[in-house]
């Protein structure tokens, strides 16, 4: 799996060396935990790692991608440790799990996210991917400040009952049980998924290790609005893929 994509001030590529992977792990640690260190786990060696760099070659965003041939392999993904994915396990179609997506605090530029999605799109088209999914994170472990966001998810964006993951993690909170008071907005990555027709499960997982709440999020590629799909493909047209 290779990818190379450039657009204006930023370029996206896959990590090629041990040093590249270490750079991704360091940025992840900085974004998720703060300070110096490396965020690494057993999934890193089996994933591709997208790097978005600025014109100076500085890493400003990263995400890791786990490609699986069909739902029959979904048990090996990160999300399977937190959610019951038996619905998606019945889908005979190639999928990619997007994980550990993060952007450097001093690079919160909409173009960074746009370039990352351009890179994802090129890969999706080249591989014939039918589903993109992952865990989208909310900072902190208290769901109350996100009450309005979770209520909106419950009202407008729940996935099909046949595919939607069921609770599995030790600590979960259902959207229906969160008072609609807190007004902190949804994270940008989740908003992007939803704008393309993505859907979510009906609960959030409390992740004490990462100090986040996360929500299973899925995008069925065939459901992306035609205008949005055309724009993403235009953005990705310079991508070089196998």
Please provide the spans of the model-predicted regions.
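Conserved GNAT-family N-acetyltransferase fold
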Residues: 50, 63, 101
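C-terminal "cap" of GNAT-fold acetyltransferases
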Residues: 211-224
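Acyl-donor binding region in acyl/amide transferases
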Residues: 68-199, 204-212
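Short, flexible loop/turn elements at secondary-structure junctions
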Residues: 16, 54, 67-69, 100-102, ...
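Short amphipathic alpha-helix that is part of the acyltransferase structural core
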Residues: 2-60
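Short, cationic low-complexity segments
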Residues: 126, 235-242
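Long, contiguous binding/interaction regions
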Residues: 223-225, 229-231
